Swiss-Prot record:
Extra remark beyond the main annotation: There are at least 11 genes for vicilin subunits.
Chain ranges of the Cupin type-1 domain: 36-194, 254-426
Family: Belongs to the 7S seed storage protein family.
Lineage summary: Eukaryota, Viridiplantae, Streptophyta, Embryophyta, Tracheophyta
Record's function text: Seed storage protein.
Basic and acidic residues: compositionally biased ranges: 444-459
Signal peptide (residue range): 1-28
Residue ranges with Low complexity bias: 238-251
Keyword set, alphabetical order: Seed storage protein, Signal, Storage protein, Vacuole
UniProt-annotated location(s): Vacuole, Aleurone grain; Vacuole
Protein name as annotated: Vicilin
GO cellular component: aleurone grain; vacuole
Length: 459
């Protein structure tokens, strides 16, 4: 029985590396039935005004049971226009913040200190839960786009923001304290505290209402606010730039491209910062990577041994294919009282399934541990990935000249595992001269097409 299973599985993985999964699977599922893809419309808008927006991706475990271990991970997107600021707030979640595009000033507050950083594309920093921070788009022309991986510390999957400025939907959290507590805390009359720090909730005079209307007009909903050039210059003072040489700081930003790519050739580049390289990522057990795939190129089939990878399409278009088992997206629980039916369902689920989807900017896809995946770029494709369970993760490639785990199988086992001889298997494995990235158009097909065109032209 075990030998039969081996013979069934190895050829499928083998073919996957050769033919981009086209003939691997018993069946195929595209976008609507694919639990591994989250299109950009799956983001919920938490806040939006003329200066920008904040969006939150739906919960991963709402999509499929296979994402139960992602219950406490959420993905947020921030976008703001030039010369704007996300006003101070803190949340009950650890954050890993990555700049997707634009230029920013991030200010991080501590009880006895304040640090400001100039951030650019690829800059990354961990913000511990409860950190008060504010973010400025310092560029004159380009929008700022930031992606956050949030790990809540109170309730799994539930985020709570605490605003110092307050808005129409949520009060300044200082207003939640009683009058006596506020007066004692600030050693100031409540009327002065209310005027300077809080939204007024008592009946206002016409003069006060006029002042408030002007304030709301200039700071609509007090989350993303316009800044003058002079204010940005003031906030830029003493802001430190990210080091391009080191990724080992415990509190300062690091850039994903601060070290050379771990994989690189003419078809693509793969940058990655792991917990071993950066202390900010160690306690969260997360790696962060950035992948560039050139138009018409392929990130070769591979799988992660332990890590679940959440991937966001930053720029470009492409296709991804993931190999799983049939019915991985079903939510129903099996009935325990029918063992034969359960065994039958398990046998069905062992059939290989091809899950594929078109990719465009803003889409998110998830790669569970052990699931082979390949990504093809129809235009230059830029991807950002967060890897959960990063410690001791091994990325195993299933095709390519280097790091190809299938090529490590001993010849006697190849004879047993594959329909062809070991010599034939080796010949196919050696046909691909590239590693990690390759041309998405097989050379044999190109050669055949060229020969066909030549014959037709001669006729």
């Amino acid at each position: 029985m075990a030998a039969t299973t081996m013979k069934a599985s190895f050829p499928l993985l083998m073919l996957m590396g050769i033919s981009f999964l086209a003939s691997v699977c018993v069946s195929s599922r595209s976008d609507p039935q694919n639990p591994f893809i989250f299109k950009s419309n799956k983001f919920q808008t938490l806040f939006e005004n003329e200066n920008g927006h904040i969006r939150l991706l739906q919960k991963f475990d709402q999509r499929s049971k296979i994402f139960e271990n992602l219950q406490n991970y959420r993905l947020l997107e921030y976008k703001s226009k030039p010369h704007t600021i996300f006003l101070p707030q803190h949340t009950d979640a650890d954050y890993i913040l990555v700049v997707l595009s634009g230029k920013a000033i991030l200010t991080v507050l501590k009880p006895d200190d304040r640090n400001s950083f100039n951030l650019e594309r690829g800059d990354t920093i961990k913000l511990p839960a409860g950190t008060i921070a504010y973010l400025v788009n310092r560029d004159d022309n380009e929008e700022l786009r930031v992606l956050d991986l949030a790990i809540p510390v109170n309730r799994p999957g539930q985020l709570q923001s605490f605003l110092l400025s307050g808005n129409q939907n949520q009060q300044n959290y200082l207003s939640g304290f009683s009058k006596n507590i506020l007066e004692a805390s600030f050693n100031t009359d409540y009327e002065e505290i209310e005027k300077v720090l809080l939204e007024e909730h008592e009946k206002e005079t016409q003069h006060r209402r006029s002042l408030k209307d002007k304030r709301q007009q200039s700071q609509e909903e007090n989350v993303i606010v316009k800044l003058s050039r002079g204010q940005i210059e003031e906030l830029s003072k003493n802001a430190k730039s990210t080091s391009k040489k080191s990724v080992s700081s415990e509190s300062e930003p690091f850039n994903l491209r601060s070290r050379g790519p771990i994989y690189s050739n003419e078809f693509g580049k793969f940058f990655e910062i792991t917990p071993e390289k950066n202390p900010q990522l160690q306690d969260l057990d997360i790696f962060v990577n950035s992948v560039e795939i050139k138009e018409g190129s392929l990130l070769l089939p591979h799988y992660n041994s332990r890590a679940i990878v959440i991937v966001t399409v930053n720029e470009g278009k492409g296709d991804f294919e993931l190999v799983g088992q049939r019915n991985e997206n079903q939510q129903e629980q099996r009935k325990e009282d029918d063992e034969e039916e359960e065994q039958g369902e398990e046998e069905i689920n062992k059939q290989v399934q091809n899950y594929k989807a078109k990719l465009s900017s803003g889409d998110v896809f998830v790669i569970p541990a052990g699931h082979p995946v390949a990504v093809k770029a129809s235009s230059n494709l830029d991807l950002l990935g967060f890897g959960i369970n990063a410690e001791n993760n091994q990325r195993n490639f299933l095709a390519g000249d280097e790091d190809n785990v299938i090529s490590q199988i001993q010849r006697p086992v190849k004879e047993l595992a594959f329909p062809g001889s070991a010599q034939e298997v080796d010949r196919i494995l050696e046909n691909q001269k590239q590693s990690h990235f390759a041309d998405a158009q097989p050379q044999q097909r190109e050669r055949g097409s060229r020969e066909t065109r030549d014959r037709l032209s001669s006729v």
